Amino acid sequence: MKRFTAQIRHSYDTIVRMCRVQDDTFCFGRKVLMALLGLALTVFGAWNLSSVAGLVFALVGCWLLVSLNFPAKNRAQSIREALHGEYPTNRYEFYDKHFVLLAQNQDVVDYGKIMRLVEDDGYCYLFVSAQAAYMLEKASLGTELSRFMAFMEKATGLSWTKPYKLTTFNLKTILELVRGGSKDKKK
């Protein structure tokens, strides 16, 4: 029995957003290390600006800090080139045991294959691996959004999480990273 339908009209912005969420979800440790190294190099360089080495350290540190999202942007650019500027509209139908991506190549996915449920303010991401996710627009679910999210938690045994952010980084985030991710499977 069909339970829900959802869709997304992709654009370059949605591709960039998905790549960033992927990075923030699965590569956040690398991002934190890059930020800490960048900060350390910038501070060290600022104390020694009178020397060439200090200037180089400061420049490299600043470059690391401003390029935290470079891997995601680079991946998004590669996807844009592969799509030749033709962004798809993906429609989904959710059933009791699986969902179907209605596209040129129809894809049937059992809920057991989903490894992580992630949400941000506008989209839901159903990750089947660290490199692949199905993205859908929350607005396309309308008033059914909360029921859909509860259904997905029950169907997958997972909890919805938000992507990690440097601005909300805390001890809880560190503990989740050490354990290898956030609340992947409900207990």
Task: Show where each model-derived region lies.
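A membrane-cytosol interface segment of integral membrane proteins
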Residues: 125-187
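N-terminal membrane-targeting/pre-transmembrane regions
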Residues: 1-41
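Generic beta-strand structural signal
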Residues: 93-94, 118-119, 128
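Residue-level signal for tight coil/turn positions that link beta-strands
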Residues: 10-12, 96, 121
